[in-house]
């Protein structure tokens, strides 16, 4: 175990000098020995010659000074894995931060690992029912798939993710890992108590590196959560991996890249953006032993989906749920855009011909309404043909029927949440498109579950 000395400290970047014959490898973890700051860990990022390595601090570098001794552990950061992590809150290093004592793990894994080989990977077409009408209809999720929730600031990414956790994780017999990457500490706290109240805390491992943490923590915390999920998958379990927020992972990479002195690329992002995203996403996969179904929130800067960060994420996903500010402005929640959201599972060979036809029918009606909006704005409804008037009326009902009350928003709305089965969703939209409910007022469709609820509501209007 070689030792070196700190020769330079610039914020989160620390240079350590070792003997020429015992220079640590890239990604090795170094421990700083100091009476006041004994727990600080550094991760080697670059070897810059003459025995000097440039590292990123996995914690606050306050009180760090030149001359302190750094011990090379000879391996990457290792974190606890296995049953002992369930019900616990950990930081990037796998240390408990819930004041419930040591984790007492039997096994630890390094956070840098190779993704499964092609031979080991497995595809799945089994659908995961979420109980959210617009998702189950337009962009169905696959068990073992990768799902992204895209949206700008304040359109409901976290609320949608919490609802999916509520509907899937609580009913799901497997295990869940929740990774908070650069988001609000309050949300992590709320999540912990929600899981506790639901009695499923013993099935969830939580790893947090929130927005007040240094960039090193935020860059590596996603890998820590993923490593815990991989262990469960390799044991033959089905795991749900929630990551909130992938954009903060990219942003932490940008900060680290700038601190290391790399030249920025497009829009100021790090030149290694695609590679860093690939390193994380390629490991989130299912094997013949078990599956990882991942749901990731992706912040979209300035609502621009062509920004390099969300654009790089798109390539890795099986289903994309796009949240729209325009739909949120109309007061229609969940503000999921049915014309922008996609899924590889929406294929007649996977979901069946009926489901496919209904979903495409809904999109066709909404697309036609979108095209007619300009004419309506200029000339008014009276100038439309009878067919177009009918299309507009149905489209407005479809828009409203795509809304539903959420369990997690019950405290704000006062309306109890509803889980809508796929069968009820298909029945409702099929009837709507065929004209069965043309005489029902459009207000009746707002915030209802199945079509039977709409008919009941219409009777009271």
Curated annotation (Swiss-Prot):
Q: Of which family is this protein a member?
A: Belongs to the ATPase alpha/beta chains family.
Q: Does the keyword Plastid apply?
A: no
Organism placement in taxonomy: Bacteria, Pseudomonadati, Pseudomonadota, Gammaproteobacteria, Vibrionales
**Source species:** Photobacterium profundum (strain SS9)
Looking at the keywords, is Translocase present?
yes
Give the quaternary structure: F-type ATPases have 2 components, CF(1) - the catalytic core - and CF(0) - the membrane proton channel. CF(1) has five subunits: alpha(3), beta(3), gamma(1), delta(1), epsilon(1). CF(0) has three main subunits: a(1), b(2) and c(9-12). The alpha and beta chains form an alternating ring which encloses part of the gamma chain. CF(1) is attached to CF(0) by a central stalk formed by the gamma and epsilon chains, while a peripheral stalk is formed by the delta and b chains.
GO cellular component: a single term: proton-transporting ATP synthase complex
Keywords assigned by UniProt, alphabetized = ATP synthesis, ATP-binding, Cell inner membrane, Cell membrane, CF(1), Hydrogen ion transport, Ion transport, Membrane, Nucleotide-binding, Translocase, Transport
Where is it located? Cell inner membrane
Question: Its principal location?
Answer: membrane
- What role does it play? Produces ATP from ADP in the presence of a proton gradient across the membrane. The catalytic sites are hosted primarily by the beta subunits.
User: Any idea what this protein is called?
Assistant: ATP synthase subunit beta 2
Q: Which reaction does it catalyse?
A: ATP + H2O + 4 H(+)(in) = ADP + phosphate + 5 H(+)(out)
Listed EC numbers? 7.1.2.2
The membrane topology of this protein is: Peripheral membrane protein
A GO molecular function held by the record: ATP hydrolysis activity
Q: Where does ATP bind?
A: 151-158
Pfam families membership:
ATP-synt_ab (PF00006), ATP-synt_ab_N (PF02874), ATP-synt_VA_C (PF22919)
């Amino acid at each position: 175990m070689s030792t070196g000395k700190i020769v330079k400290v610039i914020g989160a970047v620390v240079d350590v000098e070792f003997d020429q014959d015992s220079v640590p490898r890239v990604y090795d973890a170094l421990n700083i020995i100091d009476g006041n700051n004994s727990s600080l860990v550094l991760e080697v990022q670059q070897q810059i010659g003459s025995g000097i390595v440039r590292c990123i601090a996995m914690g606050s570098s306050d009180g760090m000074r030149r001359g302190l001794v750094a011990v090379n552990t000879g391996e990457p950061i290792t974190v606890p894995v296995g049953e002992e992590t369930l019900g616990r809150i950990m930081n990037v290093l796998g240390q408990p931060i819930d004041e419930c004592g040591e984790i007492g793990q039997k096994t630890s894994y390094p956070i840098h690992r190779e993704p499964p080989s092609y031979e080991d990977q497995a595809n799945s077409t089994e659908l995961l029912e979420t109980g959210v009408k617009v998702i189950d209809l337009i962009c169905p999720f696959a068990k073992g798939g990768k799902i992204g929730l895209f949206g700008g600031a304040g359109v409901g990414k976290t609320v949608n993710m919490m609802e999916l956790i509520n509907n899937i994780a609580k009913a799901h017999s497997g295990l869940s890992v929740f990774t908070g990457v650069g988001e609000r500490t309050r949300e992590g706290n709320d999540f912990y108590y929600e899981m506790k109240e639901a009695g499923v805390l013993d099935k969830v491992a939580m790893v947090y590196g929130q927005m007040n943490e240094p960039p090193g923590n935020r860059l590596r915390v996603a890998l820590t959560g993923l490593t815990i999920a991989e262990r469960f998958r390799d044991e033959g379990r089905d795991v749900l991996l929630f990551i909130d927020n992938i954009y903060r992972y990219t942003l932490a990479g940008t900060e680290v890249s700038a601190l290391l002195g790399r030249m920025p690329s497009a829009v100021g992002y790090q030149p290694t953006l695609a590679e860093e995203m690939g390193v994380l996403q390629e490991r989130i996969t299912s094997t013949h032993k078990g599956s990882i179904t991942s749901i990731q929130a992706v912040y979209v800067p300035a609502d621009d989906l062509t920004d390099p960060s969300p654009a790089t994420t798109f390539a890795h996903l099986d289903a994309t749920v796009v949240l729209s500010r325009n739909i949120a402005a109309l007061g229609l929640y969940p503000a999921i855009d049915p014309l922008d959201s996609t899924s590889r599972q929406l294929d007649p060979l996977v979901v069946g011909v009926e489901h496919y036809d209904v979903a495409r029918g809904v999109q066709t009606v909404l697309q036609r309404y979108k095209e007619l909006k300009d004419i309506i704005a200029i000339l008014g409804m009276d100038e439309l043909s009878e067919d177009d008037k009918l299309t507009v009326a149905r489209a407005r009902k479809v828009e409203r029927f795509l809304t539903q009350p959420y369990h997690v928003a019950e405290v704000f709305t006062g309306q109890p949440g509803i889980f809508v089965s796929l069968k009820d969703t298909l029945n409702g939209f099929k009837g709507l498109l065929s004209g069965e409910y043309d005489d029902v007022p459009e207000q009746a469709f707002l915030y209802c579950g199945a079509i039977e609820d709409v008919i009941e509501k219409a009777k009271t209007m």
